[in-house]
Amino acid sequence: MSQPLLALNWKMNKTPSEARAWAADLSSALTPGNAELAVLAPAIDLPVLAGALPAGVALGGQDVSRFAAGAYTGEISAAMLRDVGATYVIVGHSERRTYHAETDAVVAAKARQAQAAGLIPIVCVGESLDVRERGAQVDFTLDQLRGSTEGVGENLIVAYEPVWAIGTGKTATADDAEELAAAIREALAGLYTAEARSFRILYGGSVKPDNIASICAQPNVNGALVGGASLNVADVVAMSDALR
């Protein structure tokens, strides 16, 4: 099974000076562990972090344009992210789908651009509370997965993020996470020629130091996409230690 990934999504937090201080604190506190760490920061922070993160900690973006270049004011291209040192980029986060009306087709286009530039897309999928209450979470999430990976190569990561658990303090149980992660892995095996076990599947949704170990102990969960807890270095170190 693949090395677990602790993907730290800062969302719209931290100025460049705050990012520099955070990276210095992490350098002092972090000890090598079993999990790979990746900081997914606002684009304006990436140049600062590229020269300040501890060795072995990867860098990534939170979004990317579906276009390669051109007259798209305010957009960040995959080539720009790659040039600044990014390895990963999130596509299709539920906040982008909700606040910016991103469709599965748009998400797939962004993932294709990311791969064309040498980035690894972290494709986010997951259901809302009303879908879960209807018992349709597996069908909904797999439909979203298929639409969001249309024409996308197999060098990707999938993050299962139940929308009802993001920023709410509610967390899917370890069994909930495993149910969807197993279904996603089976679906990926049908979509790609790579071995099913080679794909990394993350869980995202109110992940904290006190629940990450039980969630990531599930056989089909290979790490976590962490939001709020990623902003505090002590929490990051605790989560990294929990994945030893």
From Swiss-Prot:
It is found in: Cytoplasm. The active site is at H93 (electrophile), E161 (proton acceptor). Its EC number is 5.3.1.1. One of its GO terms (biological process) is gluconeogenesis. Keywords: Cytoplasm, Gluconeogenesis, Glycolysis, Isomerase. One of its GO terms (molecular function) is triose-phosphate isomerase activity. Its main location: cytoplasm. It is an enzyme of class 5 (isomerase). One of its GO terms (cellular component) is cytosol. It comes from the Bacteria. It catalyses: D-glyceraldehyde 3-phosphate = dihydroxyacetone phosphate. CDD domains: TIM (cd00311). Pathway: Carbohydrate biosynthesis; gluconeogenesis; Carbohydrate degradation; glycolysis; D-glyceraldehyde 3-phosphate from glycerone phosphate: step 1/1. Substrate binds at N9, W10, K11, G167, S206, G227, G228. Involved in the gluconeogenesis. Catalyzes stereospecifically the conversion of dihydroxyacetone phosphate (DHAP) to D-glyceraldehyde-3-phosphate (G3P). Homodimer. Belongs to the triosephosphate isomerase family. This is Triosephosphate isomerase. It comes from Deinococcus geothermalis (strain DSM 11300 / CIP 105573 / AG-3a). The gene is tpiA.
